[in-house]
Amino acid sequence: MSSMEERMELGVAAAPGSSSSGLGVGPVGGALDAGPGSAGLAGIQEESGVRRDGSVGEADPDAPPKKRVRLQEGEAGKLEERLYSVLCCTVCLDLPKASVYQCTNGHLMCAGCFIHLLADSRLKEEQATCPNCRCEISKSLCCRNLAVEKAVSELPSECSYCLKQFPRSGLDRHQTEECQDRVTQCKYKRIGCPWQGPFHELSAHEAECCHPSKTGMELMGILDEMDQSHRRELQLYNSIFSLLCFEKIGFTEVQFRPYRTDDFITRLYYETPRFTVLNQTWVLKARVNDSERNPNLSCKRTLAFQLILKSKVNSALECSFLLLKGPYEDIKIKPVIQHHVFSNDANETEYAPLPICDSVECNKLLAAKNINLRLFIFQIQK
């Protein structure tokens, strides 16, 4: 069968029901003159983007551009998510806030977790190892990864006030100096104005603030309250300085890790691994909203902690202790001195509130993978 006959059969097959008389055959090598039945073949060719001359058709210029833009934005978002998983710490699975260390095989650790691993190994009297590949790690074997530190500093992070995206390296400056929605206080706070609000409302408030026009007698009562608060704060710091003069002082970095109870309705609680301070073994526990049934339904969030002595003691052990933020954390926590006499029968303190500023700070702690704090214990000699 000749090539001409093959073309005719192809045209008939593409247009069933059409007679052969409906097809006009041109010169050899020319195109088939399409009859009524060949419109389907042309339509198929046009839909598939293949022209009759064999070239591939371009994308439809009338396609809505918004869809293409959204696709690109989605791809960028996925790239950021992938970078988060690639650059995160292998221990806490969070992005590093300060220095980044790597083991000899290249696994990344944030400075807080790296120091914590070395401290744990010292307490257990064993060699510290990378949690991923189990190779030995130490300050001499591990080195900083400056490329990762710079990459992490350029990743976008959300401002907690205006909810806009900024590079992590410039986020602190934006939130403290530039953001128009950052929380600020009235300049007349010194004479008792309690106003707090967004920065863009500060000028309007100060123009209407009533405290500058108050009489001296009215201001005296306000200043007395402020003096009492100042005296309490000064007394706290004097007490801390007195404790620092004790003979037996111990401190360590502790890491609260989240767990769930075995109840039918599980409750969130935190517990630290066992640690040694003043030659005794201890554990810290923490609970949310005093273990209420549904803390997720409450807008007010609190954390309370207790210190537990795990060692057996021959005599009563009287101690003062306090919790502060860890060396690489940005938690706003106020020091509060706790006191307890430990014995074999009374080895647990009462739950005391973790002295954080407000529910916003508590939510930051709950959102983190782990809570890193520093514990000081002062043994009182009799």
Swiss-Prot record:
Signal peptide: none annotated. InterPro entries: Sina-like_RING (IPR049548), ZFTRAF1 (IPR039338), Znf_RING (IPR001841), Znf_RING/FYVE/PHD (IPR013083). The keyword Metal-binding applies. Keywords: Cytoplasm, Metal-binding, Zinc, Zinc-finger. One of its GO terms (cellular component) is perinuclear region of cytoplasm. Residues 1-72 are annotated as: Disordered. It is found in: Cytoplasm; Cytoplasm, Perinuclear region. Its main location: cytoplasm. A zinc finger (RING-type) spans 89-134. Residues 10-22 have a biased composition (Low complexity). SUPFAM superfamilies: RING/U-box, TRAF domain-like. A zinc finger (TRAF-type) spans 147-203. GO terms for molecular function: zinc ion binding. Belongs to the ZFTRAF1 family. This is Zinc finger TRAF-type-containing protein 1. The gene is zftraf1.
